[in-house]
């Protein structure tokens, strides 16, 4: 009898590729099924993207096939957002994905797409697959907002940002103006319309896999299943199978970061990393540096060249270091280290000396921190990170955050220092509660994936439903 075969399709960009790769690894290793990942590349021949795919192929038990994306410049407005371009790319990839599936010797029976690829679900019907699912690599609150967005679109007048009251999501935490995703800020824009369309298409799947777990978001998951209004919109089963995060990779060669961390006290270092797209303005970089210095805490800072906050530009050491305050590196020598190249985030967060994480709050990064019991200083920059920061601080209680969004004003050095001390200083009462909660979440994350844990059982419930396991 042939081994069951699942097909996963990853949208362009590392932020979408990595969660799909990790999901594929989990499905293959836990369920003992064959997994093929179609990785739609960005089309920019990015060395980082290519390296990530090749590295993943080397360590994964999944089969990975790259599909170059098509040029869609003639299909979008000149000022189209990155989100819009990616959605249009995925729409245009339908023939290529269909052809790739038809060429497979071992036919997949189940297709899984991400939120950007919901239009590809029709391919599953075209080629005779038995089931099609959507994977949401972020949390249940995000899923609830997305599937309820078409309802909001019909009942709310005007721009959401102009409404003083938070948007009500049945059975869930309301969404305030400061939590709105960028895609929701302009209702006349194409990216908003694409979000509404996807919100309608998600319930047309056979179910949704979401990267959270019952103990973390039980109330929101219950609302998706049981709330009279929200469950009527959701329509299909929701399977919480998280946390699914990158696992530790052994660092073979000597690494100055870990040599330095080995010399530090347990839980005494704050790790600062704002993600692959986390570049700051020059002024904000200076204030963050001086705030770290003022805090008196030890730090590891992964720093990128200042740009607009959506810059995502890396550069060489000299250019990055030139953006720091004069004398900063000399004054903090021995207290902190500044890293200007890629750094192994999961391995750093796993180190015993790390006691806090100043993060952009991408959900993958947040989970990497929470599964290690490391509390977070929330520094949201874009996309759904504003929602994530609120969830981490107000709902889960494992983070502190800036008084205003960093995208709206420069966060001063005094506030930076205060936030760092709150998480790192042993005597801070609020920090003690946050650290205790972070440890509680770490334990619950391990429990969720233990045998007969909530996520373990949820995955097997899904696999049985689509005949991937007996």
Curated annotation (Swiss-Prot):
Coiled coil: none annotated. Keywords: Glycosyltransferase, Transferase. CDD domains: GT1_Gtf-like. The keyword Transferase applies. UDP-alpha-D-glucose binds at residues 276, 343-345, 360-368, 382-385. One of its GO terms (molecular function) is UDP-glycosyltransferase activity. Its EC number is 2.4.1.-. It comes from the Eukaryota. The keyword Glycosyltransferase applies. InterPro entries: UDP_glucos_trans (IPR002213), UDP_glycos_trans_CS (IPR035595). Belongs to the UDP-glycosyltransferase family. This is UDP-glycosyltransferase 72D1. It comes from Arabidopsis thaliana.
